[in-house]
């Protein structure tokens, strides 16, 4: 309906246009034929316009062909709207034939064919080959990236990567190809084969197998059960022994050792009662073991354990006790056993008893005192006191005074406790010896011995009582001295304490002390009143003549220069125990003296200034002298260029920037770039680090054994790559990593025939080049 309406509207418009165009285009006198042709033309235009409208929904109208008057063989009319005939329309007969089918196939093949492309140039083909080969190789190599990354990130690489399992050949194979050649080997093999010893380690020996064959089934089972039980018990005992061996408790091992010793002693007593001959043999074995211990240097404090304990003995009480036990063991082993005969025992009589009453420590101290080492006298003060009390009890106060002056600090109570313990042990030993000697000696000798032992015991009691009183009095003095002012401390002590000053250790004077003494002598030349000092010195010089000048020097050193002009008397005597400030001053002086002695023959300051002058001169820019002898004047041997010519051709260097250490006299700053240090500097942040402060922190952290433990030092300095000597390092295989290389047939085809490239390869080449 819409199409009809449009057609009517278009007809109306066309009629109006015709009416409008009549007076312009055509005259009234024109012929009717021309009008008809023009109408047909416009009508045809109108139909074409209508057919072009709404072509999608337009319905095809059936056209009717009319027979024409003139039929030409060259102008065949075709069905439909097409004006030209197609070859396919002519080939469509009523019935299909095979010949027409082949023609159709040929036509379809001709239609599918296109124009042949021009072949590529040789350069383009080679470039495509290179690109394809590069992409293929990169794809193959990219599969190794995880392996390479893993090896780079590893903390340590040990080559060869594959651990070769050692091939352990059984002993049968080894023995089959080996024969005994030397006579010793032949004898050993003959003995083994004679006794039917197995070459391997079977479960049962041939003897056991023969015994099993002779047994019944029940007996064999019982025997096997016994063997299993014995092996199980053996494994249990071995495991227990391993556990006990791992125990590090010294107390546990000491208890076990004592238990074993007691058990061995009981067994020896039982053996002595049952079988005396076997007991004698056992005693000989024990004596032989003791001789072996004496021959070895096990208890000489020269081993690694003893040295480590000696270092820690100052701080660790257990280490001190262990060292003491080892020393006592050494003394016990090195002591010679004196076996006296019966005649000597009868002749000795009372002399042996009297010698036994004297303690061994006194004899040792007396022997040491006569020896060539006088420095050992100070370490044996307690022993000398005991010897002095036994020789002359009246000199006891003097010896006590000497001992108190020499012992300092915390060592005093320890020495006193050791003395008391030693006294107690001596009493007990004396009591035992007296009990043993009562049965063997007559009554007369017994009385003399009892009287001698009573005297010794009384002396020891007096000694212990005096030590206790001295200890209490020293405590009271120490508490009272804390409240006494400094002036009272410097007052002269009574005559009984004179040995305290005499026993004070001497020290070498330093240069600073000599300077201070020089200053003090200047003050002394001014004739200051010193009556007290002179009086005290006059009293002491007759008693101790040789030590007087040394004491005078020490007393002068202890004088305070600030108190010289005061009315108070200067200090004469110092305390026996030095104060903390005095100890600190002495340490500083010793340190300075040590430095002076180390650099005694070196003028360090002068050498330093000379070195700095040389460094400054070397850093200054140098003048360039361009004078050439013989240019413009005579030249030769012995002739030098004139000064005028030198000034003319001398290029003076500009002054450089001021040095950083110009105003620092004690410092040399090297402004040159260190080539050796530059080799270790980095311009780019290394791989594992993500920020510069991480790298700086690792560089600043010391890795030496001085600042780290041994285990940390070894971990920090482990090499990146470790190779085992004697092993062949083979390259990594794809099968080891778990990757199999793909087939490269395409590349092989291209490389074999680069000139003949199929369409498939061309497409692949284009695709690879685009990618």
From Swiss-Prot:
The modification Citrulline is found at residues 433, 589. InterPro entries: SSU_processome_Utp14 (IPR006709). There is a cross-link at residues 122, 449, 519, 733 (Glycyl lysine isopeptide (Lys-Gly) (interchain with G-Cter in SUMO2)). GO terms for biological process: rRNA processing. It holds the Pfam family Utp14. The modification Phosphothreonine is found at residue 205. Its main location: nucleus. Residues 342-355 have a biased composition (Acidic residues). The modification Phosphoserine is found at residues 29, 31, 52, 77, 81, 405, 407, 437, 445, 453, 569. Residues 535-544, 740-751 have a biased composition (Polar residues). Residues 399-436, 504-529, 547-557 have a biased composition (Basic and acidic residues). Citrullinated by PADI4. Residues 40-67, 216-290, 317-347 form a coiled coil. Ubiquitously expressed. The human genome also contains the UTP14C gene, an autosomal retrotransposed copy of this X-linked gene. Evolution of autosomal retrogenes from X-linked progenitors compensates for X-chromosome silencing during male meiosis. Interacts with DHX37. May be required for ribosome biogenesis. Belongs to the UTP14 family. This is U3 small nucleolar RNA-associated protein 14 homolog A. The gene is UTP14A.
């Amino acid at each position: 309906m819409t199409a009809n309406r449009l057609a009517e509207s278009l007809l109306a418009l066309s009629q109006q246009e015709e009416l409008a165009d009549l007076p312009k285009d055509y005259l009234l006198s024109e012929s009717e034929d021309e009008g008809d042709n023009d109408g047909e033309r416009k009508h045809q235009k109108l139909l074409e316009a209508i057919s072009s409208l709404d072509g999608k929904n337009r319905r095809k109208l059936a056209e009717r062909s009319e027979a024409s008057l003139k039929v030409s063989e060259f102008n065949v009319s075709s069905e439909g709207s097409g004006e030209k005939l197609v070859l396919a329309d002519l080939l469509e007969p009523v019935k299909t034939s095979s010949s027409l089918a082949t023609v159709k196939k040929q036509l379809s093949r001709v239609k599918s064919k296109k124009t042949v492309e021009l072949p590529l140039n040789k350069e383009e083909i080679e470039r495509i080959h290179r690109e394809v080969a590069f992409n293929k190789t990169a794809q193959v190599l990219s599969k190794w990236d995880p392996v390479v990354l893993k090896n780079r990130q590893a903390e340590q690489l040990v080559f060869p990567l594959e651990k070769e399992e050692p091939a352990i050949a059984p002993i049968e194979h080894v023995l089959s190809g080996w024969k005994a050649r030397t006579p010793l080997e032949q004898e050993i093999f003959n003995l083994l084969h004679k006794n039917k010893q197995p070459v391997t380690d079977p479960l049962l020996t041939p003897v056991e197998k023969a015994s099993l064959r002779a047994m019944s089934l029940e007996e064999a089972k019982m025997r096997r059960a016994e063997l299993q039980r014995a092996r199980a018990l053996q494994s249990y005992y071995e495991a227990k022994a391993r556990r006990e061996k791992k125990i590090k408790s010294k107390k546990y091992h000491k208890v076990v050792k004592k238990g074993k010793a007691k058990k061995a002693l009981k067994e020896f007593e039982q053996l002595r009662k049952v079988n005396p001959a076997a007991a004698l043999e056992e005693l000989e074995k024990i004596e032989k073991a003791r001789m072996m211990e004496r021959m070895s240097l096990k208890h000489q404090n020269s081993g690694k354990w003893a040295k480590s304990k000696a270092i820690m003995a100052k701080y660790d009480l257990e280490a001190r006790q262990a060292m003491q036990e080892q020393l006592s063991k050494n003394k016990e082993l090195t002591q010679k056993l004196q076996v006296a005969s019966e005649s000597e025992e009868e002749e000795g009589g009372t002399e042996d008893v009297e010698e036994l009453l004297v303690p061994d420590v006194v004899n040792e101290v007396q022997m040491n005192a006569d020896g060539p080492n006088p420095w050992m006298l100070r370490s044996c003060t307690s022993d000398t006191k005991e010897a002095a009390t036994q020789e002359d009890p009246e000199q006891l106060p003097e010896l006590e005074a000497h001992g108190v002056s020499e012992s300092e600090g915390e060592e005093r109570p320890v020495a006193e406790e050791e003395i008391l313990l030693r006294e107690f042990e001596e009493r007990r030993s004396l009591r035992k010896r007296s009990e043993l000697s009562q049965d063997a000696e007559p009554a007369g000798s017994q009385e003399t011995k009892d009287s001698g032992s009573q005297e010794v015991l009384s002396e020891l009691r007096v000694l212990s009582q005096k030590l206790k009183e001295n200890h209490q009095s020293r405590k009271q003095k120490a508490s009272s001295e804390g409240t006494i002012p400094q002036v009272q401390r410097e007052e002269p002590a009574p005559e009984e304490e004179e040995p305290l000053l005499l026993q004070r250790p001497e020290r070498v004077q330093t240069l600073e002390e000599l300077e201070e003494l020089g200053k003090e002598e200047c003050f002394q030349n001014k004739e200051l009143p010193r009556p007290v000092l002179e009086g005290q010195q006059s009293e002491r010089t007759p008693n101790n003549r040789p030590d007087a000048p040394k004491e005078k020097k020490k007393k002068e050193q202890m004088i305070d220069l600030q108190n010289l002009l005061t009315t108070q008397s200067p200090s004469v005597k110092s305390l026996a125990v030095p104060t903390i400030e005095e100890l600190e001053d002495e340490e500083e002086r010793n340190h300075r003296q040590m430095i002076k002695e180390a650099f005694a023959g070196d003028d360090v300051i002068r050498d330093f200034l000379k070195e700095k002058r040389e460094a400054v001169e070397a850093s200054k820019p140098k003048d360039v002298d361009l004078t050439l002898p013989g240019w413009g004047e005579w030249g030769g041997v012995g002739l030098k260029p004139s000064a005028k010519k030198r000034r003319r051709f001398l290029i003076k260097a500009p002054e450089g920037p001021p040095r950083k250490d110009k105003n620092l006299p004690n410092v040399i700053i090297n402004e040159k770039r260190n080539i050796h240090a530059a080799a270790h500097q980095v311009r780019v942040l290394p791989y594992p680090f993500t920020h510069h402060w991480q790298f700086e922190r690792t560089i600043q952290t010391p890795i030496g054994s001085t600042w780290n433990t041994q285990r940390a030092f070894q971990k920090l300095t482990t090499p990146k790559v470790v190779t085992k000597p004697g092993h062949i390092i083979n390259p990594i295989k794809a099968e080891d990593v778990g990757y199999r290389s793909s087939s490269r047939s395409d590349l092989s085809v291209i490389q074999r025939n680069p000139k003949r490239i199929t369409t498939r390869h061309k497409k692949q080449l284009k695709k690879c080049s685009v990618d």
